[in-house]
């Protein structure tokens, strides 16, 4: 459908007249008797308000200069090979910028059989919507860190650009649309950090979604629920509200050879254990997806790793938490890519299992027994770090038989012992540490907290799938330190989508 544009007759004027008038107005106010009696915060507020208008007028003048300099063309050819010879001067368009609304004028070329084309739009890379890329980036950065209402309210005190909440939600998806393309093309020098270990890891974290965006099985289970109370959910009735997002990370780390005692800690002079500081993760990338399934995210992990080390010149390791489905998917993807990577079970998860077992033998309310429980956990943990997970599991079973445990506690002991025996190959910590490999998933645990918990759990809201995915992508870009690079890439892709594809070749770039 042909869009309607206002036709304005061209005029000759000094584009910066209004700008100079505004600047003189500010200077005059600063020199006025009233200003002499103002406090510093009142001056600051006035300058901020009037300065925003000055910036808006400067932006308006800059657009006017480009509009007045635009040269009339005999014809413009679109991608449809239709030659547009009908010419219109001064076609207006409203633009919402960080400084407020401005009016943008340009020449249009049309034909009854094709859409109207504006060559100056391509030269200025004008967005498809009325919101400038600067305003979009500002809004996106704010809402990916805080609730939409709070973010928009906070920004309203800093910038003059206005955008409704619904449009802000839509812009999140639009701004994040080039996420995968950005990382697929990103130039990474192979073996950027020679001698380092390439570490991969993934985990899952639930996000509360709207009913229609839950996975089919979860949605069906939610439909079958019957709530006891009308005004609130009872115990156990908050299930089937979330969809699992898969969180992933790839990073480099210097090898860190250590022993079990180094991890557990040697007794210091103050009676507290002292531990060696581990090297920090470098060149870290974290991301998450709630749209893609676990297998697709695992594929992305491999793709990112191959971009970093295509010839497999460095050691690769995969840190896991022991989830059965996770391990099955990882092994399937690795087999498809014909790569062999040692899977390392997160030592922190192992400690959690040991603590579950210890409270079957000790009373947490008794101080002496609680201290004995801590000693027991450290003793078993050191044995596991020394590569003796099998004997530890056997010892736990023997101790359980000697104690008169309840059926519930016996079930806990069986779970812990089976966990250790079923993952023996992933618990060879003595070998892993000797090779300098990491054995804990601190990076991925931090990513789960930063990407998901710190944003999606602050309001208790149910999210739409599209908006949740957009927020995850934007938070991942920022957490990986790629925000500015991504914004530059996104604007270039927008130019290709909105302008280059509409013309028969890049009209202005060819001249």
Where are these regions (language model features)?
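Catalytic center-proximal scaffold of phosphoryl-transfer enzymes
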Residues: 1-65, 106-511
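An N-terminal low-complexity regulatory-tail signal and nearby short nucleic-acid-interaction modules
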Residues: 64-128
């Amino acid at each position: 459908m042909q869009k309607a544009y206002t036709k304005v007759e061209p005029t000759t004027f000094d584009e910066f007249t209004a700008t100079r008038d505004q600047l003189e107005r500010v200077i005059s106010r600063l020199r006025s008797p009233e200003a002499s009696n103002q406090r510093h915060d009142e001056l600051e507020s006035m300058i901020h308000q009037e300065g925003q208008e000055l910036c808006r007028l400067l932006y308006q003048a800059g657009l006017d200069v480009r509009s007045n300099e635009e040269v009339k063309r005999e014809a413009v050819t679109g991608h449809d090979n239709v030659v547009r010879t009908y010419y219109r001067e001064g076609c207006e368009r409203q633009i919402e910028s960080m400084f407020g609304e401005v009016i943008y004028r340009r020449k249009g070329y049309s034909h009854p059989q094709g859409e109207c084309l504006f060559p100056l739009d391509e030269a200025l890379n004008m967005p498809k919507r009325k919101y400038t890329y600067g305003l979009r980036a500002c809004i996106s950065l704010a809402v990916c860190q805080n609730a939409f209402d709070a973010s928009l309210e906070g920004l309203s005190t800093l910038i003059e650009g206005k955008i409704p909440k619904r449009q802000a939600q839509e812009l999140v998806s639009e701004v994040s649309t080039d996420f995968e393309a950005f990382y697929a093309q990103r130039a990474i020098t192979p073996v950027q950090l020679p001698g380092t270990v390439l570490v991969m890891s993934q985990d899952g974290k639930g996000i509360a979604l709207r009913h229609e965006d839950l996975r089919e099985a979860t949605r069906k289970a939610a439909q079958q629920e019957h709530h006891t109370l009308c005004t609130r959910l009872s115990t156990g009735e908050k299930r089937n509200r979330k969809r699992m997002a898969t969180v992933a990370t790839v990073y480099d780390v210097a090898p860190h050879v250590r022993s079990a005692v180094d991890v557990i800690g040697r007794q210091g002079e103050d009676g507290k254990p002292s531990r060696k500081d581990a090297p920090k993760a470098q060149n870290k990338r974290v991301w998450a997806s709630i749209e893609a399934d676990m297998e697709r995210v695992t594929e992305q992990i491999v793709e990112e790793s191959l971009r970093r080390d295509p010839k497999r010149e460095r050691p690769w390791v995969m840190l896991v938490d022991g989830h059965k489905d996770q391990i099955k998917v990882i092994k399937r993807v690795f087999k498809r890519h014909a790569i062999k990577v040692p899977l390392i079970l997160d030592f922190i998860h192992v400690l959690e299992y040991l603590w579950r077992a210890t409270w079957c033998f000790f009373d947490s309310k008794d101080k002496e027994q609680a201290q004995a429980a801590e000693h027991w956990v450290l003793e078993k943990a050191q044995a596991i770090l020394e590569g003796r997970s099998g004997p530890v599991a056997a010892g736990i079973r023997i101790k359980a038989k000697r104690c008169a445990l309840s059926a519930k506690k016996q079930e806990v002991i069986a779970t812990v012992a089976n966990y250790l025996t079923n993952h023996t190959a992933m618990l060879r910590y003595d070998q892993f540490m000797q090779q300098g490999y990491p054995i804990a998933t601190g990076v991925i645990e931090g990513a789960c907290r930063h990407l998901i918990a710190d944003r999606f759990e602050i309001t208790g809201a149910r999210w739409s799938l599209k908006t949740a995915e957009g927020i995850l992508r934007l938070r991942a870009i920022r957490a990986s330190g790629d925000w500015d690079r991504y914004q530059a890439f996104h604007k270039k892709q927008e130019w290709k989508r909105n302008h280059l594809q509409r013309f028969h070749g890049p009209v202005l770039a060819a001249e």
